[in-house]
């Protein structure tokens, strides 16, 4: 029998046994579902980790090319044109579109960068000289922004999945190592107590049956003894009655004596 610390504090009854069996079945089902959820999330987590590594490598290459392109623009134009671009820009050309992706019940945010149509505030920048370098630099930094948005989306999903996987794994471990063993120990305890009660009940019924047999045997013996006593008394009464009848009958004098033969 398990210790009280390793089982639920329940009263050992048939109803408690049914409740514990239902709880065990629910715990096993929940453990299976959470295990599959953890596996699905872990698979997606590894995929996101691989994509983050690729995105970082891509980001490094793109930023390197963008830096070189900006240096070319500065050299071709003959100075820093950042202030001209800032003065010309009225609204953001790049916009972020957010959506959610459901992965095994977990909502992961996904960001997507797109360019607003008809928004080209600094199209005339570099018209005098360095126009090709400016256009190439703009396209390069556009790819850099898209890479940054993709990396931000992946890293956000990475952080969320990391926390969710930890929570799910804690639940799986709690069910596997705490809830299921405690419930199984409780079921074993209830079964052992019920078996003990059944043995006690069987022993009690056996003792009751033996007592009934002894009582019946004693009753039969008493009835037989009583019947034999009645028969003996009846026989004695019959003998007494016959004796009294014999004493009360008149004696036959003639019959008692034999007649002597007379010889003439």
Swiss-Prot record:
It is a peripheral membrane protein. Residues 255-264 have a biased composition (Acidic residues). One of its GO terms (biological process) is vacuolar acidification. It is found in: Vacuole membrane. One of its GO terms (cellular component) is fungal-type vacuole membrane. Residues 214-264 are annotated as: Disordered. Residues 214-230 have a biased composition (Basic and acidic residues). Its main location: membrane. It holds the Pfam family ATP-synt_D. Keywords: Hydrogen ion transport, Ion transport, Membrane, Transport, Vacuole. GO terms for molecular function: proton-transporting ATPase activity, rotational mechanism. Coiled coil: none annotated. Belongs to the V-ATPase D subunit family. Subunit of the V1 complex of vacuolar(H+)-ATPase (V-ATPase), a multisubunit enzyme composed of a peripheral complex (V1) that hydrolyzes ATP and a membrane integral complex (V0) that translocates protons. V-ATPase is responsible for acidifying and maintaining the pH of intracellular compartments. NCBIfam families: V_ATPase_subD. V-ATPase is a heteromultimeric enzyme composed of a peripheral catalytic V1 complex (components A to H) attached to an integral membrane V0 proton pore complex (components: a, c, c', c'', d, e, f and VOA1). This is V-type proton ATPase subunit D. The lineage of its organism: Eukaryota, Fungi, Dikarya, Ascomycota, Pezizomycotina.
């Amino acid at each position: 029998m398990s210790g009280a610390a390793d089982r639920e504090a329940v009263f050992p009854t048939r109803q408690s046994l049914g409740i514990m069996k239902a709880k065990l079945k629910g715990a096993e089902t929940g453990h299976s579902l959470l295990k599959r959820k953890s596996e699905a999330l872990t698979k997606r987590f590894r995929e996101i980790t691989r994509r983050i590594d690729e995105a970082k490598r891509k980001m490094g290459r793109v930023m390197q090319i963008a830096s070189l392109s900006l240096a070319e623009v500065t050299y071709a134009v003959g100075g820093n044109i950042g202030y001209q671009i800032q003065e010309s820009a009225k609204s953001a050309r790049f916009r972020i579109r957010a959506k959610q992706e459901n992965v095994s019940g977990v909502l992961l945010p996904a960001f997507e960068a797109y360019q607003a149509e008809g928004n080209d505030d600094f199209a005339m920048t570099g018209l005098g000289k360095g126009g090709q370098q400016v256009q190439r630099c703009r396209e390069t930094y556009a790819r850099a922004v898209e890479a940054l948005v993709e990396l931000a989306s992946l890293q956000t999903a990475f952080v969320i999945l990391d926390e969710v996987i930890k929570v799910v794994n804690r639940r799986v471990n709690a069910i596997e190592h705490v809830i299921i063993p405690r419930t199984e120990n409780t079921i074993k305890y209830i079964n052992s107590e019920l078996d003990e009660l059944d043995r006690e009940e069987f022993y009690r019924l056996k003792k009751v049956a033996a007592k009934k047999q002894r009582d019946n045997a004693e009753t039969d013996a008493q009835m037989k003894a009583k019947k034999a006593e009645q028969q003996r008394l009846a026989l004695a009464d019959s003998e007494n009655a016959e004796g009294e009848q014999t004493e009360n009958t008149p004696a036959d004098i003639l019959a008692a004596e034999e007649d002597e033969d007379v010889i003439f």
